[in-house]
């Protein structure tokens, strides 16, 4: 490898269950830690979700994401617990991504105790990410994204707080942001949201209006 090249290898759990990834330093040219479960019609047919995954005490840097789910999640991703992440010089701190045609689900994800020092985006949850393996996929097969909690996040030198962009006919639901504080060296870009419902508590900068106050939702707490 040339001394100026960035290693592309990272750590991916794909169609895996009962996995623990911990106590690691990673520097890569890809998402540092990612969870996947198959790609479009092939992942739907294989039908093996990633579940029961614990990730903790990870430090690292990447031009992409620190922790990611997707975008290939056609077999489903559920019951994921992530804590104590320390990322610097990132593209995106936390990136949850899927697309029309994927199908599957992303649910019961909890991410907490995250420190970011330098990122284009603190957080992205998006339903329009990733290509398709061929033309045989069904664009009407939509993923379900439900019950994603992100809490106790502190970031500095962040260019834009975050983007949460669901799918018109499959709104991302029960998205909870709690004690999420993101600051920029200058004026930080605001949250941008659409096709999402959920709650927000003690979030800086102020969250988008699509995330109702916790008194209206009841599921999003500190």
Predicted regions located by residue number:
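Extracellular/periplasmic carbohydrate-active domains that bind, remodel
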Residues: 1-222
